[in-house]
Amino acid sequence: MASEIFGTAAVFWVLIPVGLLGGAILLKLQGD
């Protein structure tokens, strides 16, 4: 059970920053 929770947390820790960076880059490209 602990490994599943840790794995899910790790996925979120990776996806959230990637999503934020991706969104910022898209907004920057659209701005131009």
Swiss-Prot record:
Location of the protein in the cell: Cellular thylakoid membrane
Pfam families xrefs: PetM
UniProt GO BP: photosynthesis
InterPro entries hit by this protein: PetM_cyt_b6/f_cplx_su7
Keyword rRNA processing: no
Alphabetically ordered keywords of this record: Electron transport, Membrane, Photosynthesis, Thylakoid, Transmembrane, Transmembrane helix, Transport
Membrane-spanning segments: 9-27
Any one of the GO CC terms: cytochrome b6f complex
Main location: membrane
GO molecular function, one term: electron transfer activity
Keyword Cell membrane: no
Membrane topology: Single-pass membrane protein
HAMAP family tied to this protein: Cytb6_f_PetM
Quaternary structure, from the entry: The 4 large subunits of the cytochrome b6-f complex are cytochrome b6, subunit IV (17 kDa polypeptide, PetD), cytochrome f and the Rieske protein, while the 4 small subunits are PetG, PetL, PetM and PetN. The complex functions as a dimer.
Family: Belongs to the PetM family.
Role according to the record: Component of the cytochrome b6-f complex, which mediates electron transfer between photosystem II (PSII) and photosystem I (PSI), cyclic electron flow around PSI, and state transitions.
Protein name as annotated: Cytochrome b6-f complex subunit 7
Taxon lineage: Bacteria, Bacillati, Cyanobacteriota, Cyanophyceae, Synechococcales
Gene name as annotated: petM
